[in-house]
Amino acid sequence: MNSAEQTVTWLITLGVLESPKKTISDPEGFLQASLKDGVVLCRLLERLLPGTIEKVYPEPRSESECLSNIREFLRGCGASLRLELLFPPSQPPQHLVTTILLSASTFDANDLYQGQNFNKVLSSLVTLNKVTADIGLGSDSVCARPSSHRIKSFDSLGSQSLHTRTSKLFQGQYRSLDMTDNSNNQLVVRAKFNFQQTNEDELSFSKGDVIHVTRVEEGGWWEGTLNGRTGWFPSNYVREVKASEKPVSPKSGTLKSPPKGFDTTAINKSYYNVVLQNILETENEYSKELQTVLSTYLRPLQTSEKLSSANISYLMGNLEEICSFQQMLVQSLEECTKLPEAQQRVGGCFLNLMPQMKTLYLTYCANHPSAVNVLTEHSEELGEFMETKGASSPGILVLTTGLSKPFMRLDKYPTLLKELERHMEDYHTDRQDIQKSMAAFKNLSAQCQEVRKRKELELQILTEAIRNWEGDDIKTLGNVTYMSQVLIQCAGSEEKNERYLLLFPNVLLMLSASPRMSGFIYQGKLPTTGMTITKLEDSENHRNAFEISGSMIERILVSCNNQQDLQEWVEHLQKQTKVTSVGNPTIKPHSVPSHTLPSHPVTPSSKHADSKPAPLTPAYHTLPHPSHHGTPHTTINWGPLEPPKTPKPWSLSCLRPAPPLRPSAALCYKEDLSKSPKTMKKLLPKRKPERKPSDEEFASRKSTAALEEDAQILKVIEAYCTSAKTRQTLNSTWQGTDLMHNHVLADDDQPSLDSLGRRSSLSRLEPSDLSEDSDYDSIWTAHSYRMGSTSRKSCCSYISHQN
């Protein structure tokens, strides 16, 4: 490898330069672009000698900030890389003190920023690499990547014993040292964490495994043997086994082992402090960001009257309480870091505040979907307001990001605590609390995500139109107490259907999703009065289930997604049924009709012509939907989200005209189309089982039609002989009679008239045809006109015959 490739590898190994996602064709160009802003250089010097960098711009946005970072690196090199290397007393006196100085005048800051004389920059880094390799700096770990923010120096690094520093000096002398079985004092280490190999030459192990080190290399990777397998592993994942713990080997050898002072304990302590300081700094930064969002944007917006008070409350949520809580948390962590390391209880601090934190963040996440809805509806006004307050364009994005910070911060806690645990001593008093805190934060983060998803779905249901909705608007039911997606199984049926249950103060609403998940379909409502909730034990047929029963409700089995969802439903329903039983004891069953099947009742608003009708179920107070054969089902058959469209079989019976419609039914239908179709259904005659017509029946029906036609003609003649007033009255009577008997007259008319007569039967009309008044009226108007023409022809022929 050339010098540029070696330098890139060195920086990536130290963790100060991110590894590129693809192969680098020009290492020197990649290195020049990476070093231009000076951030990587400052990270490098801080990695080698923590506390050296005093001021750094993590994300420089101007030329001056980039040059400031580069000059800070050069200043740190000139001030700090004068290292006194003290050798053990056994060494010759002339080697007691050696001074190595890296000149800071090797390259100029402007040269690096402008891309000039990059060879000088590269030469300086190569020299720095060689110097630090000789004295053993920066080779302790490659797994822990420091924060991009400034990391302060700690006393634990400055107070390392002379013996430890001497051991680091000799670490370079023992690199590439092959330790064979003849080694007398072979280095033995014990795994502190689990490690899974990602390459073939790496060694996998579990926590607690004892590994025999066969080679110590710079860069943080050692070679060792475990259970007959040899491979490379990260050195900061293990700790050296003390002399009292080492197994006695009967074999002897001549090769030396590394100095006894070479231990990772001091390194882990230093990184523990680094991680803890990082937690404190990021926590303080997060608290300041919340204060900025409140003081700069939300509080002025509250007094500007640009939005209603309700929308302002949605945007604010409980952000004020969270901000106050985070300030208190920062103070608690600062007090904790002032204690000696052995007495620091960071995990205990988080555990003590977890109940309060859980309440605050769950409340915030439940309100967040409503806040997003306000942001969407008033994006223009809010964007303009934010920009007037100094926010960068687009201003709405600044507010959206600010309102998302609480749950974004919540997701980071498990990772931060995991890193703290990695660099903690095995027998630290706070280790168990750290582990409990990690589990608590993971659980809280999952709950917050679930609450957000549920509230987003709830908001969608309350704001969008629901297909086949019956009764008053959904907003009149009150606030949603609880909702989730469940599986519903009715008594006597083995089929389970996905449903969305929404619990309101007095009603349990049941919805299903459309096949394309584009909306929701109304399935029914159950009154909470008289409802009995029974929690069921898990079995082979159901898990996390409860049962709904009652005097007016047929037994329903509800299966929840998890145990937490089950507990929430049982508690809310039991509490709700007690409240409604005391406060609202009399609720009429028919006031909350329930459709247990995805039925499409014959109402003017229904648009599902080919849907399968629902059966009659008095226990749920469903509408009397007839089956295909005219007989109601006796058992409930739960269908899918939407019933499939199945074509009806055709037979000769389809040519048979339907029974005539009673005029009272038509008048009732025209009177009020918005009411429930129960009244109209009662007026319709029940269909008898269909059978093929015989010749005798056809002749009888034809003769009856002829007699009725003669009666009509006589009435017409009588009307012509009376006064104008009487003729007008009889004309109305004739039209009503014609309306009532048009199906019979249609049998002797032409085929097209017979086809139109079949369409006139209300019992055979599809629901979509009944949805429009104009279509319904046009059918009867056409019949009256055609029947009137036929009767007038018959009348003329009769008069001519009499004459």
Swiss-Prot record:
For bias kind Polar residues, which ranges apply? Answer: 593-606
Q: Where is the composition biased (Basic residues)?
A: 678-690
Q: What is the effect of changing T790A?
A: Found in a clear cell renal carcinoma case; somatic mutation
Q: Which residues form the SH3 domain?
A: 184-243
Give the PH domain ranges: 473-578
Please name every pair of cysteines joined by a disulfide bond in this record: none
The protein, known as: Rho guanine nucleotide exchange factor 7
From which source organism is this entry?
Answer: Homo sapiens (Human)
